[in-house]
Amino acid sequence: MNITDIREQFPILHQQVNGHDLVYLDSAATSQKPRAVIETLDKYYNQYNSNVHRGVHTLGTRATDGYEGAREKVRKFINAKSMAEIIFTKGTTTSLNMVALSYARANLKPGDEVVITYMEHHANIIPWQQAVKATGATLKYIPLQEDGTISLEDVRETVTSNTKIVAVSHVSNVLGTVNPIKEMAKIAHDNGAVIVVDGAQSTPHMKIDVQDLDCDFFALSSHKMCGPTGVGVLYGKKALLENMEPAEFGGEMIDFVGLYESTWKELPWKFEAGTPIIAGAIGLGAAIDFLEEIGLDEISRHEHKLAAYALERFRQLDGVTVYGPEERAGLVTFNLDDVHPHDVATVLDAEGIAVRAGHHCAQPLMKWLDVTATARASFYLYNTEEEIDKLVEALQKTKEYFTNVF
């Protein structure tokens, strides 16, 4: 894996910000886009922009082939059994809401339980809050260990015969914790529950095999894996999807419309009302091609090395608190003593370094950590150890500045 060659494929990285070479350490928020994806979008809009499925003209056929070809690429990428199990959405948030609206509200009743964790992104909390409110079910939380990991014993104690849904992030966007999805799926299934996985932070960085994980639903976003914004995927087991009603209605998803009744298309199109995100899906297909050419195992090893190096360098700084386990995905969330995370991010930006600051759409986790906000540096395939060195040097400057000035 030649990082220099990889970086050459990302035009945005070759610029200066505030007089410094850009160091982009915010890929957990959104990844940068390789030239191959940008050119694919350009080609679509310049050469075969058209609506899909119903047109018999050449442009329509090419657009349909590109759109459905992207669906097949996603299917292979996550090893789903059938293209019928791959639904294009606006992103992970929409995918999770779709399950909460179409599956949860139809299957929950008073006395039932939905189980989640304290580390969830708001997109995997609020839909379940609304689902239990609408159905009279109960929302429960799996506790976290001191290092921000989940104990399978705690999962077994929390998930009961009353549990109908277990919803969990594969990788925490704050702690970098990689959750044991396969083992959690077995516990859920042994209790008659389904498991819903937020894969936004795992799919870009490691091989995903939904059949091996045995998850019932899996959500992902294109923009975090070198693809365009505005498009994502919901994977669902075919038997579950077939019994679910659509959450949205309109064109594209219908089979027949009468004056008082209508019927829906078969999977997956019954869940894709309206003109779909055609360019986005085709761009996602190009991103998958790009990632597979490099290799997800190679990417995962590179990021694991970066995370370990970052933790080692952070230990050399005084007055820094790092959150999360030793073994983690490629991100480090931290705070400098007596310096607000937004101030940290502002000073780093002056050095050309982009990090994220705030609650990271995880306010319950912030409360568990007993902080209001943190700073986060997140890594991807195009980052280097030299960039981590620049980050640590800039943090040392930041610490000295606030110590001396204030």
UniProtKB/Swiss-Prot annotation:
UniProt xrefs under CDD domains: SufS_like
Biological process according to GO: cysteine metabolic process
Active site annotation, chain numbering: C361
Sites bearing N6-(pyridoxal phosphate)lysine, chain numbering: K224
PROSITE patterns registered for this protein in UniProt: AA_TRANSFER_CLASS_5
Regulation: A Cys to Ala mutation in SufU (Cys-41-Ala) has been described to be a competivie inhibitor of SufS activity and a non-competitive inhibitor.
Keywords of this entry: Pyridoxal phosphate, Transferase
Catalytic activity field: (sulfur carrier)-H + L-cysteine = (sulfur carrier)-SH + L-alanine
Effect of C361A: Loss of cysteine desulfurase activity, still binds SufU and Cys
Family matches, as InterPro entries: Aminotrans_V_dom, Aminotrans_V_PyrdxlP_BS, Cys_dSase_SufS, Cysteine_dSase, PyrdxlP-dep_Trfase, PyrdxlP-dep_Trfase_major, PyrdxlP-dep_Trfase_small
Pfam families, per the entry: Aminotran_5
Database matches in SUPFAM superfamilies: PLP-dependent transferases
Cofactor(s) the protein requires to work: pyridoxal 5'-phosphate
Enzyme Commission identifier(s): 2.8.1.7
MF GO annotations: cysteine desulfurase activity; pyridoxal phosphate binding
Family label: Belongs to the class-V pyridoxal-phosphate-dependent aminotransferase family. Csd subfamily.
PANTHER family in alphabetical order: CYSTEINE DESULFURASE, CYSTEINE DESULFURASE 1, CHLOROPLASTIC
Function of the protein: Type II cysteine desulfurase that acts as the initial step in the SUF-like Fe-S cluster assembly pathway. Catalyzes the removal of elemental sulfur atoms from L-cysteine by using the cofactor pyridoxal 5'-phosphate (PLP), resulting in the production of L-alanine and persulfide. Activity is stimulated by SufU, which acts as a sulfurtransferase that receives sulfur from SufS via a zinc-ligand swapping mechanism and transfers it to SufB.
Record text on subunit structure and interactions: Homodimer. Interacts with SufU; this interaction induces an opening of the active site pocket of SufS. Interacts with frataxin/Fra.
Protein name from the UniProt record: Cysteine desulfurase SufS
Organism, as annotated: Bacillus subtilis (strain 168)
Source taxonomy: Bacteria, Bacillati, Bacillota, Bacilli, Bacillales
